[in-house]
C-alpha cells in the first residue's frame, strides 16, 4: 500500500508542484483547500503537469481554524506543510504572522497527535539572512534572521517567527514525529494553471510590458520543480531529521532576467523592458508608491546563501537560473498569461 502524504495549501504554486511530484512517484496524496469549489481546479492543474490525479483526495480546512486538522492528517505517514502567506501586500502584517505561526502550529500539533513520521515545512531563505540589506556575503542555515530587527518587513518577520515557533514546538514535544524545514529563494519555473501565480508575477508583468523600467535588484532563483524535489528528498532522508536546508539557486539581477526572457521567448518578449532605472529614480518613486518601498531597501544588494548542505546531505542539484527563467516565461506564454 502506497504511503499517504498530506500537502497543505493545495491551491498554491509550490504545493501543486509537490503534489504532481508525489503522484508521479506513486504516493497517495491528500491536500487541503479552504474553498471546496477549488478542488476541480487543483486536480486539473496537477493533471496538466503530466501526473495522474487518481490518488489525489481533498480535505477542507483553514490554517486559521482548529477544526478538521486531525482528520486531515489521519492515515498520513508524511506531511508537507507548504501553505503560507506570500507577503508583499497579500495581507495585513498581523494576519500574515497569525496565518504563518498559528497555521504551522496547528499542522504540527495535529501531526504529532496523528503519529505522522515526518513533517517538512516550507520556510524561506529570508528566515536565514542578515537583518538588513547592508551586509553582503554568503550565509548558511546556521544564521537566523532576527525577527525583532528594526525595519524588518512583515513577510520576513512572519516566515522567521513561524519557523522558530515550529522548532520550539517540536523540541518541547519529544514525540516520534520529526521536522525538517526548507528555505527557498525566489520561486520561478513552469506554471500548472492560470491562477495563484503570485510567485511568478514579476516574469508575467515583464512579458506583458507592465514594468516600464528595471530596478537594480536581484533574486536567488530556485525552480519550482527543484523545490518540490528537495521537499521529497527531505521527507524520506534519515539525515534530514531536525535540519534546515537552504534551497536557493543562482543569483540573477533583474536586468539579467529581462535579457534571458528576450533571448528565450522570441517575439512574445517584445514588451520586456530594456530601460534600467537608477537607484535614485526608484527611491523617488517609492515615496508615492508603497509597493516599491520593499524594493528600495534592496537596491544593489547581492545577499547570497550556500546550498552546500542540501547538496551534501540530500544530493540536491538544482538546475540553472537561466533555464528556470526561460521555462517560466515560455510556460506563461503557453498559458496565454503573457
Q: What residue spans do the PLM features occupy?
A:
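N-terminal Rossmann NAD(P)H-binding glycine-rich loop of SDR-like oxidoreductase domains
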Residues: 3-27, 32
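A conserved pocket-lining segment of Rossmann-fold NAD(P)-dependent short-chain dehydrogenase/reductase
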Residues: 146-151, 193-194, 200-226, 233
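NAD(P)H-binding glycine-rich loop region in Rossmannoid oxidoreductase-like domains
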Residues: 36-37, 47-102
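Glycine/proline-rich active-site loop of Rossmann-fold NAD(P)-dependent oxidoreductases
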Residues: 173-176, 189-201, 234-245, 338
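Mid/C-terminal beta-alpha module of Rossmann-like enzyme folds, strongest
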Residues: 230-294, 312, 323-338
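Conserved Rossmann-fold NAD(P)-dependent oxidoreductase catalytic core, especially the SDR/UDP-sugar
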Residues: 81, 90-153
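Active-site Tyr-X1-5-Lys
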Residues: 149-179
Amino acid at each position: 500500500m502506497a504511503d499517504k502524504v498530506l500537502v497543505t495549501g493545495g491551491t498554491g504554486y509550490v504545493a501543486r508542484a509537490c503534489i504532481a511530484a508525489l503522484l508521479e512517484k506513486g504516493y497517495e496524496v491528500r491536500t487541503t483547500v479552504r474553498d471546496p469549489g477549488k478542488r476541480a481546479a487543483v486536480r486539473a492543474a496537477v493533471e496538466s503537469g503530466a501526473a495522474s490525479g487518481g490518488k489525489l483526495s481533498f480535505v477542507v480546512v483553514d490554517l486559521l481554524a482548529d477544526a478538521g486538522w486531525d482528520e486531515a492528517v489521519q492515515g498520513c505517514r508524511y506531511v508537507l506543510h507548504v501553505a503560507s502567506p506570500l507577503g508583499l501586500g497579500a495581507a495585513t502584517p498581523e494576519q500574515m504572522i497569525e496565518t504563518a505561526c498559528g497555521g504551522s502550529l496547528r499542522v504540527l500539533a495535529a501531526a504529532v497527535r496523528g503519529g505522522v513520521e515526518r513533517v517538512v515545512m516550507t520556510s524561506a531563505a529570508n528566515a536565514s539572512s542578515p537583518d538588513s540589506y547592508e551586509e553582503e556575503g554568503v550565509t548558511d542555515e546556521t544564521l537566523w534572521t532576527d525577527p525583532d530587527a528594526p525595519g524588518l518587513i512583515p513577510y520576513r518577520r512572519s516566515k522567521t517567527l513561524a519557523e522558530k515557533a515550529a522548532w520550539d514546538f517540536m523540541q518541547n514535544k519529544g514525540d516520534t514525529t520529526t521536522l525538517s524545514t526548507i528555505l527557498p529563494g525566489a520561486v520561478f519555473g513552469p506554471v500548472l494553471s492560470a491562477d495563484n501565480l503570485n510567485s511568478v508575477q514579476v516574469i508575467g508583468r515583464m512579458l506583458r510590458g507592465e514594468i516600464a523600467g528595471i530596478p537594480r535588484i536581484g533574486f536567488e532563483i530556485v525552480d519550482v520543480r527543484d523545490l518540490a524535489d528537495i521537499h521529497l528528498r527531505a521527507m524520506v532522508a534519515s539525515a534530514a531529521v531536525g535540519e534546515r536546508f537552504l534551497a536557493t539557486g543562482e543569483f540573477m539581477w533583474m536586468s539579467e532576467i529581462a535579457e534571458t526572457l528576450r533571448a528565450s521567448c522570441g517575439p512574445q518578449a517584445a514588451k520586456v523592458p530594456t530601460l534600467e532605472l537608477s537607484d535614485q529614480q526608484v527611491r523617488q518613486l517609492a515615496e508615492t508608491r508603497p509597493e516599491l518601498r520593499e524594493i528600495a531597501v534592496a537596491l544593489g544588494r547581492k545577499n547570497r546563501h550556500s546550498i552546500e548542505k542540501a547538496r551534501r546531505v540530500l544530493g540536491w542539484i538544482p538546475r540553472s537560473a537561466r533555464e528556470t527563467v526561460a521555462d517560466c516565461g515560455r510556460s506563461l506564454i503557453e498559458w496565454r498569461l503573457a
